[in-house]
Amino acid sequence: MIEDKVGKKPYLGIVIDYNKEKKLDKFSLDTLQDRYFWENETHAQEAFARAAVFAATYKGETDFELAQRLYEYSSDLWFMFSTPILSNGGTTRGLPISCFLNYVPDSRRGLSDHYDENIWLASSGGGIGGYWGEVRSNGVATRHGSRSTGSIPFMHVVDAEMLAFNQGTTRRGSYAAYSDIDHPEI
């Protein structure tokens, strides 16, 4: 932290309490500073306030009473904003979305498009959930006469993508693969 601030102070249209920094241990404060603070923020209370004001704003109108309550709840550690909200909400970096859901078509073009989409989604700050239920299982004939290797080898490619593309500056990408319970590869 750059300077020691104490007491209650107005910030972004609400009142924050710098004394609540004491509720966080050193590891938490260091992690917040390293990954979640935005430009001129020096304290966790400022990041909590930014996220609270962002979450209480709809179509350009901010409900400051709601923002104050959200700030109080997060600064008292009763709940915490998701990573994309705390790191990106109210800023110009990344997206304030926790999870994107996408569909994996059963074609080479569809798989290629899925990989490309994942690169952009992961680097924008959100986790990804991909539906693989339409991808043919291992050993099924393709229209070109070969046999499918199933969805699992293609999921390994997605895993490598998540290792390679970070969610902004906060963490590596995350991905959850979904399929139907009656899919032959389950």
Task: State where each predicted segment sits.
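Extended catalytic cores of very large enzyme megasubunits
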Residues: 1-186
